[in-house]
Amino acid sequence: INVTDYLSQPVVIDEKMTAYDAVIALFTEDVGTVFVTAAEILVGLVSRKDLLKAAMGNNDLRTLPVRMVMTPVSKIIYVEGDEKALVAAQRLLEFEIDCLPVVRIEEDEQSKKKELHILGRISKTNITRLFADCAAGRRA
């Protein structure tokens, strides 16, 4: 069973947006993580914890660029779309995180840098749904 069988829609904001925009996205979409993109390429993510730290630092979230509070892509744990759901579950447990971006990796022809294109997200809830489906005999 691949992660793409159980992924959910990611909540995404542009890197030009503010930390306040990220707060609004978190609460209106009822998620714990918002992915940050630039020209549809994943550049980071923002969690509730990141935003709480920024707010406690007496920052004005309405003017603070989301880039200043996000976890950069170089530190993000992810899964590729063709990986097994078991791999995603193991990473969630190993790194003690709530969700992973599901990505397609491409190489930029000019810079030869790896670019992550976000396909979705897989969370503990998605993995629990898979487990429940297997236990109920709805998945082999």
What kind of feature is each model-predicted range?
Residues 12-30, 37-38, 77-98, 102-106, ...:
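The conserved cystathionine-beta-synthase
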